[in-house]
Every structure is written in structure tokens, then in C-alpha cells.
Amino acid sequence: MPVRRGVVIGLSALGGFALTVLWSAPFVDKVIGDGVTSAILGHEAAEAPMTSALAGIAFAFASGLGGTFTACNIAALGAVAPLLGQQRSLRSRFAQTLPPLGWLAAGMAAVSAVYGVVAALFGTHLPQYSTATASSGLSPRLVQSMVVFGVIGLILCYLGLAALKIVKDPLEGVERRFPHIRSLVMGLLIGAFLIGRPFGLYRQLFRDVADSGNPLYGAFAFVTQSLGNIVVLAVVFLLLSVAAGGRVQRWITAKPGRAAVITASAFLVAGVFTFLYWDVRLLARTGVIWYPTITWY
């Protein structure tokens, strides 16, 4: 590849690290997350009554959309660049835009639905159900977040290195038989966010699903929550692909290796951020290690 791969890796890792230093969970979760959800619902999200399955599903979508830019969902934005790297003709640009989004949504829905059923049947015994706070150390639900997002972060980093041909690409052979495998895998990862998500409004939904004991409601609510998470991602992808797709595609293909660099950078920034934020910065809350942060909110 006619680029210095070390530079791409270094700058991407630096970008992911810088994002963890600057990230303000109170601002993103409360101001943006709660604010957007409350605006959609028309009342304070924290006081939203889920008196029926329909009300719960409406809350699920609103809180999913509101949680688009929370730390547990930021890795999903790394899915946009790999999708843009795919070839598509000018005449059928819109038609060719839909299958990648469809497979991404399918993978996401599969994991979300299964976990929704698990939450409905066994949720009262899972860490995400608990409202307890740890006076020192980490609560069980944060330990669960560390494990889930740590694994997701490492997977994203590996995919970034694979895009640069530094490690073997596990999807390359499958892609020849199933061209949309990468979109499906990204969907599976986005769906798995629910397994580790500590976002307050999501846990509010989780408790309602667990208390209901209704697997069908759990599946629908969790799929709807995940769909809300990717609305912004889908809009950005459609705008870049359809409205500016010709210019974007020409720019990506103008230089050999540019598509791979963009894909790798997106995966590496998202992966480094996800791993460092959830497995290193979070650990610093216990006092075991020190991690640099800039408090601005």
C-alpha cells in the first residue's frame, strides 16, 4: 500500500486517545442524550411513564436516538466509512445504498432481539437491572460494560489493522461469496452494544422489559432502541452516498489505497476510543491507575 501504515495507525490511535481525554459523559449523556429524548417524548425522559408496551417502544426509539452520541454508541459511527468504500454506479446509487444498510440493520436486529428476550426472561438477575452504586471500585454493571466494550474495541482495532493488510482479514474469503458480510458484522457489533450499555435511559428501559417478563415486548423494544441508535448514521450514509456520492466516490478512488486508509482510520479511531474509554479510563475511577482527562462540563 502506497502509504505509511505506521503513520495511519499512529494518528488514528492518537485521535482515539484524544477523544477519551476530551469526552464528557455528563454532557453527552445528560445534555444531549436526555435532552433529545425529552424533546421527542414531550416531557422529561427520566419521568417517562411506560404504562403500556406501545409507550415502552416509543421510549425505546426516543432514547435510542438520544443516545446516538453516547460513549457506548460512538463506535457505530465508524461503520460509515467502510460502507462508503464500496463501489456503486451513478445510475443505481440509491438502490445500491440500501442493501448495506439493510444487512447492517438485520445483524443489529438479530442480536438486539435475542438480548431483549434474555432481558425479559432473566433480566432481574442481570447486572444492568441493578440501580446500586459502588462506593468504591466498579459496580457489576460497569464491569459488564468493560468486558463487552473492551471486546468490541479490540475487534474494531483488528478490523482496522486488517484493512491495512497488517493482519489477516477474516472476512476477505467470506466477502467473495457474500458481498455484504462487513455490513452484517457491523450490525452484529452495534446490536451487542445493548449487552454492555450503562446509559441511564437504556437501563430504565431494561428494567421495564425485565419487570414485564414479556419476551415479545423485550425483543421489539430492544430492536427499536437499536434502530434509534443508527438513524443518524443512516442519514449521514445516505447523504454522502446519494447526494454527494459521485464526488465522494471519485475522491476515494482517485488514489490507490485511499479507501483502505479511510476504512482503517475509522475502525482504529473507534476501536482505540472504545477500548481505552471503557477498559482504561473507567478503571482509573477506582484509583488503581491514573488516566488524563480534561473536565470542561
Identify what each model region corresponds to.
Residues 1-297:
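Hydrophobic alpha-helical segments characteristic of multipass inner/organellar membrane proteins
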